């Protein structure tokens, strides 16, 4: 007897050849097959009178064949066959290419249902290669048909047949993992009905009922799984830290911290003295002072006898952290080291030795931290910067450097709390919702191409005053013809240097450069050796040049609000007035609304809410960390209400049964373990 783990080759009607084709889509088991959901649907239920047909629409027509197919050859050895179908309202031409093998399929007087796209041809309406079936024996017309994502060698016909065979094979096998009380409370259909109608909807209403059930289940399982991960974290001991006052740290800082920074530090320190490993996200706007929260946690860990590590996504940012933190922490006799992929072998050996013998308190690193030869004597705290560059699995790899270290994650992308659990998984969240005093407001302007000469004159004026300018240009091209990043940016910079700003120094920065090249360009720009830095969005994250007072974004319509806000955050870091100029000629209403928001506020949290409202959570969800189960059917751009429902239901259930050990909840726990297979050991 089959089960959901049965290889699809053993399903009746599929066999070896079709199974090999399905494997290209990641479908190897019966469970994979029924969970391979359609990407859309084609409604073939509406039969229209011929007189009412409009060119461009895909519809069903019921009519009588007016004449046998007439076939003849055309150029290239192809054949064409024609006939006409009539109903009470008019007639429609039917054209078939290369249908010799079916020339007897239609005869005069046959009554059939035809489905296809209507076209105009010399004032007559026609369908080319329509699907057709005898009336009363319909399988692919007169119903809502699924449209599946495909790959080479897999047709819609194959997928439809395979899905039908898969559903027939597992009709009695589908466990309903949702507890009855949850299903009934949220008015959800049974699982068999859901799978049948997500693949082969009986009606648009049945499709909606099925989708609602499956989306809810997916989000409910995800939430329960993450709750179990958090529960597991509470069951292990973290690096021991004693309670102590933070005042000695605060008193020796050269500036006062904001209330929001102190609250975030209190959250983190509370975690560290709890006896459990901290796993906290600290999110705050650009320039809100997240690094000082990290510095406080580093000081607290070192005071408690632990080593610490700070992991940055790029060498530029790692070096910047080192240059900012090392002098600050030296006030507290904390010994810092910078470990990146480009340091020399001798220096690397010395740092590794210092980590192993405990003489280095803080190591600031890029991905080098994850290599096997980096061993710490007593690692107690890991800080990762820019969460979306690292995922659950990478954090797990970091954890292996020590026995469940405290972990603090910094993110400059404010995420609405509704999404935080889904995107950041098992992290607790602290929010820094105020800026340090003196942080410059950046004046922002959204301008069309006609303003370019004035923008260029403004850039010259700033440069003459000794200030510096970022110019960011996105890669412009069709999806399958994206230009070479290096060539595109270099060519644009050359044009600016030779034709627009021959009297200024123009530098180039792009993602194809080697780390040392990027570092050299950024160091030169920070030292004032260039006036203008032309860049791709490599400057989006963390780059700090206080003398840069203007950010010009070309083709600003190609960026999301949150990304534009991150770019704007590269200026306004010094004492001089700063500006952000968004160039775009787009007439799209949504784009204009997005750019208008940028001119109205510098508040990253308001911007993230507007981004969510205008574009849905796709941008946020693109930052979702690796190691969490893939979303197969939920779409958070339209399923936010269901996310709220599912999260509430999951929390209520797990408040009653935190480990899901009650007999009625065990199928749910087993399903969660399957979904979180990469983290299954954490769910034990």
Regions picked out by a protein language model, each given a short descriptive name:
Residues 1-11, 20, 221-222, 232:
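Long, highly charged, low-complexity intrinsically disordered interaction regions
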Residues 36-66:
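OB-fold nucleic-acid-binding modules
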Residues 64, 117-118, 225, 556, ...:
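Short, surface-exposed secondary-structure boundary micro-motifs
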Residues 71-252:
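Upstream accessory/linker segments immediately N-terminal to the RecA-like ATPase cores of bacterial MutS
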Residues 234-237, 277-596, 656-659, 684:
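Inter-lobe coupling/hinge segments of SF2-like helicase ATPases
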Residues 255-278, 292:
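N-terminal pre-P-loop "Q-motif" helix
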Residues 587-684:
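C-terminal accessory region of SF2 helicases/translocases
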